[in-house]
């Protein structure tokens, strides 16, 4: 199923979903086949947060990329994007969706990021994005470790959640992992490809900041982003 997402000012992003799997048959191994509200909210937030120039020539990692909406939006904004997912089918879908949206061939990495089984270069990314990757609080320490390993000093992660997690608990977990934590909220209409019978969903966007170091190593380190989210209380 081909879905179209209108995101000014970059225009329409077309994403192929693997919608042959019905909702009742979804499992953690098939969630990647669909675009979910958190991904739509995160994509919209990224466009507003960075505009048309804020991600140009930045290195971005789409963590648990699924069919690739969020990473493709970053690519349309001029970023160099790496897509990471444990499912080979997801990475194949990303490659098709990148071609569909006029992007260069996608750089993809297969692996289970939350158990250290991936091959992501350390200290290589200015921004890490992830929609619906924080639903299991038992995985938060592993996510924190992965983010600390992959982000450059001064880099940030943007993680989207549709209200499944306890905010204060998440804040504490990632602060213990060494990050600053702030939050924004994005309201999305769902499903976005309809004009009637829409529901609204509030999406929490958590911004995790890795502090710059005094002697950054590698391209772009220490050239961090300015936070625009409000602190979580």
Q: Language-model segments: which ranges?
A:
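Short conserved micro-motifs on helix faces and helix-strand junctions that flank
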Residues: 129, 216-217
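Glycine-biased, low-complexity coil/linker segments
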Residues: 218-222
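S-adenosylmethionine-dependent methyltransferases
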Residues: 1-211, 233
């Amino acid at each position: 199923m081909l879905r179209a997402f209108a995101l000014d000012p970059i225009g329409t992003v077309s994403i192929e979903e693997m919608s042959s799997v019905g909702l009742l048959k979804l499992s953690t191994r098939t969630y990647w086949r669909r675009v979910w509200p958190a991904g739509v909210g995160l994509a919209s937030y990224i466009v507003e947060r960075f505009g048309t120039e804020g991600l140009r020539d930045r290195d971005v990692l789409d963590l648990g990329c699924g069919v690739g909406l969020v990473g493709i939006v970053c690519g349309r904004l001029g970023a160099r994007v790496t897509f990471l997912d444990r499912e080979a089918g997801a990475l194949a879908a990303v490659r098709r969706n990148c071609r569909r949206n006029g992007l260069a061939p996608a750089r993809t990495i297969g692996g289970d990021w939350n158990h250290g089984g991936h091959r992501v270069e350390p200290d290589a990314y200015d921004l890490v994005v992830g929609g619906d990757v924080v639903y299991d609080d038992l995985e938060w320490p592993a996510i924190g470790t992965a983010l600390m390993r992959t982000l450059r000093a001064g880099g940030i992660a943007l993680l989207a959640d549709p209200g499944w997690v306890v905010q204060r608990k998440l804040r504490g977990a990632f602060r213990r992992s060494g990050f600053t934590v702030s939050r924004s909220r994005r309201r999305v209409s769902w499903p976005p490809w309809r004009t009637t019978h829409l529901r609204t969903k509030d999406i929490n966007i958590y911004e995790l900041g890795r502090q710059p170091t005094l002697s950054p190593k590698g391209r772009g380190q220490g050239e961090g982003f300015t936070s625009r989210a409000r602190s979580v209380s």
